[in-house]
């Protein structure tokens, strides 16, 4: 059973932090280009990353280029395109490549067909494709059928449903696989994973985090594998602010203790 999340984690423990972006750190907007992560939330993430020796990553369906732009001026480890591309703490990238001929043929087919559905949008991500229908929900079934046809023609591709979107991505890639990969690397290894996400695309991440004995947090309504729930993005912001406030207080207390110890020694 998923429980409401009302408390922050014990700060003395070692956590590895993973955050989805759209619908978790930032409100969903009619168009992806309109999404913004508030400056104070980015500052909080940086503080949390520093306190955790860098063990914080953004896990998203967006590309890593988009994630870096949204996280400026900070630079975090990332998993983009649902794990099809990943950047570790050292800046090394791990990318699943799609043969150029396949990517080109899929793109041509999708561009040709999606023109029949006004309001629907095709987002090409190199090795993956997203069919957005937030502005044209009446086309959901048709776009799902289109995506299924693509995966039948190219079985190395798989479907990933999300909120008002269906994605076509390399088979075997997922947010869960990305989190599992991070958890095998420094500085994440040996820590307890915490993952916050709002969408169907995040369920694979929840499954991995649960298996590792971590904290999985669903944002919003709907059935989920997550153990905890926050009602919406403002609740995520409030929860993060509680954590960062506690971290700052802990840091101030440590400085005070260090000063007192120094004073007694002279």
Curated annotation (Swiss-Prot):
Enzyme type, top EC level: hydrolase
EC number: 3.1.3.12
UniProt cross-references to InterPro entries, sorted A to Z: HAD-like_sf, HAD-SF_hydro_IIB, HAD_sf, OTSB-like, Trehalose_PPase
Cofactor: Mg(2+); Mn(2+); Co(2+); Zn(2+)
Keyword Metal-binding set for record: yes
Annotated GO MF terms: magnesium ion binding; trehalose-phosphatase activity
Signal peptide: none
Keyword field: Hydrolase, Magnesium, Metal-binding
Keyword Hydrolase appears in the UniProt entry: yes
Protein name: Trehalose-6-phosphate phosphatase
Lineage: Bacteria, Pseudomonadati, Pseudomonadota, Gammaproteobacteria, Enterobacterales
